[in-house]
Amino acid sequence: MKKNFLAVLFALALCSPTFAQWKPAGDKIKTPWGEQLNPKNVLPEYPRPIMERQDWKNLNGSWNYAITKKGEPAPNNYQGEILVPFAVESSLSGVGKTINEHQELWYQRTFDVPSAWKGKQILLHFGAVDWKADVWVNDVKVGQHTGGFTP
């Protein structure tokens, strides 16, 4: 069964190389760990050990991204690729751009859901969303989040 994770909108309040050619955007906070990062197998461990289950799929890796003016519709074209789970501002994302309060950041990824999951409930886990996200699957808005770690 083909699931198209059409777009995840991260509207940040404060706020391209191809996958095979991924590289950090600059040398900010360079570490041995970052130098050993494999963009084809990014942080493969289960993200929430307390909820670990046998059937799961890691969506870390290369996603399309676009930065648009706040309030614009979903983009038809994306500006490049971003390495998830790293923030767009970080070097390890491969982007290294800062988003301001007049902009929104869109992520897009297509993936296959294993046929054995047909008819089962599927949990999409986001390790962090910095302020606001609208989640779309197959052109259908399936959820939203507002908050983050702000007091």
Regions found by a protein language model. Give the residues of each.
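Bacterial Sec-dependent N-terminal signal peptides
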Residues: 1-22
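Generic structural signal for beta-strand residues in well-ordered domains
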Residues: 7, 13, 56, 75, ...
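N-terminal pre-domain segments of enzymes
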Residues: 21-57
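Extracellular/oxidizing-compartment recognition motifs
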Residues: 22, 27-30, 37-39, 88, ...
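A short, polar/charged loop/turn motif at coil->beta-strand junctions and beta-hairpin connectors
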Residues: 23, 27-29, 53, 57-59, ...
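Generic detection of short hydrophobic beta-strand segments and adjacent strand-loop junctions
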Residues: 57, 82-86, 109-111, 145
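Core domains of carbohydrate- and sulfate-ester-processing enzymes
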Residues: 59-104
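Accessory beta-strand-rich segments of carbohydrate-active enzymes
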Residues: 64-68, 97-151
